Structure formats: structure tokens, C-alpha cells
Amino acid sequence: KIIYFGKSIEQRMNGTCAGGTGAFLDQMASLLNTDTAGLNELAKGYQTIYPIASRCGVFAKTDVQPLLNEGAAKEDIAVSILQAVVNQTISGLACGRPIRGNVAFLGGPLTYIPELRKRFVETLHLTPEQTIVPEEAHLLVAKGACLDAKDMTPISVEKLKSKIQVLRQSHDTTTQPLKPLFTTNAEYEEFKTRHE
């Protein structure tokens, strides 16, 4: 996830797959017969970074397995996996928008895998002054949510349903909604029958 702070807050999140997440890193580490702590240790001793896909764990595995078969150093594969996460985050989430200024590294993988942070810092050419690694960075988002919710007034389920209904009825003039695939249950049932 990337959050840009400017005149307004812009959040960008990967909604397509697990590439770049802790689960992805766990899966890649298992290919090297280690865990994420071991992946971090291996990455410290690298010589070469290889291109590896991180869009999807399956694609990444098809890049990692041949490297293992060809005898590439596990250190090089480990750092290449971390660099793949960096590349995916920058290209897939930033989508060409520069990542500038101070950068705070939050969340589990960025807390527990310092070599991943290092890859981001080097790739983004961040200075030590621009690099922010808060204490308990893995908990900072949860703490923020608690602080934000502290002054909120609880509402009933009925009131929440009412608010959701109002949102559904509001019209966003910047986008045109798509027509529903089926306007009635009968149309849906006919579709299911046709495609069984």
C-alpha cells in the first residue's frame, strides 16, 4: 500500500494478488528452504540481482526455480525476490507517480525484513533523512485507526444500513455506472441454465 500526503490524501493498494505481501515472501522463502528471517540474512550477502516477477507467486516461482536449477547463489535469489517486491510496488502502485520526500516504512514485511527496506531506499535514492522507520512500525496503522476511532460516536446497525443506502443512491458525476448484467432473477437463472 502507498499513501501520498499532499493537498489531499491518496491511497493506492494492490487488489489484484498477493505479490509483494508477507504471504508472497513466505512462499518465496520456502523455495530457498528458509523463512523470511533467513531470506533477509541471505540477501545481505548478494552479488547479483536477477529479474523476478512478483505480480504473482506462480510467475515468481517460474523465475526462481530455473535460477535454483542453474546453481545461482541463494543470496542472489533472495535479494532478487526482495527487489521484485520493490519493483512491483513502485510500478504497480505508484503507476509512474514519483515517490518523493520523506518515506515512512510501515507494516510487517518492512519491519521484519530490513533488507527489503534497504532495497526500497536504494531504488528510490532516499537519504537517511528521508527514511522513516518508526518504533513498532508494524503496529502504527492499527494505532492510527484506534486514535481515529476514539472520538467517533457509535451508531446502530440500522443507522449504518441507512447510511449505506444513501451512498448507493448518491450519484458520482465523474463516473458512469455499468448496467447490471441481469435485471431480474429470471434473467440470471436463464443464464445459469444456458451455461451449465
Q: What role is predicted for each listed range?
A:
Residues 12-20, 80-82, 109-110, 132-141:
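Active-site nucleophile and cofactor-binding loops and adjacent substrate-binding regions
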Residues 9-48, 138, 147-151:
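Glycine-rich phosphate-binding loop plus the immediately following alpha-helix
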Residues 1-6, 196:
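Gly/Thr-rich phosphate-binding beta-strand-loop-beta motif of the actin/hexokinase/Hsp70
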Residues 60-91:
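Adenine-nucleotide phosphate-binding core of ATP-dependent small-molecule kinases
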Residues 152-196:
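Flexible inter-domain linker/hinge segments
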Residues 25-26, 133-170:
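Glycine-rich phosphate-binding/hydrolytic loop that grips phosphoryl groups
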Residues 94-123, 134-138:
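Glycine-rich phosphate-binding loops at beta-strand->alpha-helix junctions
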